Amino acid sequence: MADVDLLGKYRSAAEEAFRLETQQRYAVPAEDEQFRAFAEGRPMPSDPRVDRSMQIIREAVARGCRIRRVHIMDLPLNLYLRYELAAYQENTDAGEEVGIALRRWHPDLAELAEDFVLFDPEGPHPGVVWMRYDDRGQLAGLVHSDKPADVALAASYRQAALAHAVPLGEFVTLAEAG
């Protein structure tokens, strides 16, 4: 798998970057302290890596690029997914549109099991970065493609995910109401 500068692709996106998350747990060593704090009910410490990502989102949104994400979750929500819901607030504060879709409620989401970021699908230079994870949820590699068939497949997955996603704030309110 070739090296892919994912943050660089966000920086150069002109119209849209769409992230689909399908994993129920991501093993990201850099998140360990934040996750531990969340699990213990303490405030999550700042993380320079997250701060850098949020700055990239703010800059993209400021130049008119739409940044969106949908996480397809399974019920019951595990502790990691509850952590993600809390951590996403930082993303929305930076201007990213975050949606949540429940796989059990929408059978057509069952086939969506591969993470990716789709860049500028309607633009002159569309591309998709497929994100490969191992069984533990660790990122195993990134694969970039600008092949029309790959972009079209990712765009169809994006449409399915967006059709069933609920905005983060609405989902959290519904989840808290029980």
PLM region spans:
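HKD-type phospholipase D/PLD-like phosphodiesterase module
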Residues: 74-111
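A structural signal for short, well-ordered beta-strand segments and their strand-loop junctions
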Residues: 18-22, 68-71, 99-102, 118, ...
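HKD (HxKxxxxD) catalytic microenvironment of the phospholipase D
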Residues: 106-144
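Hydrophobic helix-cap positions at the C-terminus of alpha-helices
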Residues: 59-60, 91, 161
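Short catalytic/ligand-binding loop motif for oxyanion handling, primarily in non-cytosolic enzymes
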Residues: 27-29, 77-80, 138
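Signature of lipid phosphatidyltransferase scaffolds
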Residues: 133-178
